[in-house]
Amino acid sequence: MLVVEGLRAGYGKVQVLHGLDMRIEAGQLVTLIGSNGAGKTTTLRALSGMIRPESGRILLGGTDIAGMPSHAITRRGLAHSPEGRRVFSTLSVADNLVMGAFPRLTGSRPRGDVNADLDRMFTLFPRLSERRPQLAGTLSGGEQQMLAMARALMLNPDVLLLDEPSMGLSPRLVSEVFATIGRLKEAKITMLLVEQFAAAALEVADFGYVMENGRLAASGPARQLRDDPAVRAAYLGAAH
């Protein structure tokens, strides 16, 4: 479970988040939608320790992780798949996945069966299985996105943050990525999804939050938000 209380964060003197409150239950897929510049990516960066919150609490399994360095947050079980994919381009697909399990291999996370989880990733992402020895930098954009997601999953995270997984992808690859997210949901992976395609995000999610100018403007079950006239007009391309 991830609980956010009164989160304020920004960059230097520019405050982006103004007292954010959110809750993600175990096994739940929650989406955060909003226009560009609303503060969605900043939210994920604050949760994962990429930027330090100014105030507020971030409770991961009951422990306040606000202000911890990102590596410490990762060890506590929060994995972040950031926008832009950011794979290790000079490493193979298989080695990228092993890097995702690094906290487990060094004893800072429960080790479990890393090899079995590698096989599980290759089953979940069959295209990656076909490219195990290939350098990550030579993969297509869609394949790199799948690799970034799979690498984050190799942590065996308690919570997975996904930032714009469809960014820059063709419609066909967007469909593949969302099909994969659907399979992760079926596996009861706890996820917070930030996504530019609000309709697709609300279709797959259990619950949603709508962000405007660093504040939450609406929240509710995803189906309810999909049917809300104001949300449809603002984010789903539908008229009142």
Task: Describe the function of each predicted region.
Residues 52, 64-85, 89, 108-118, ...:
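ABC ATPase NBD coupling module
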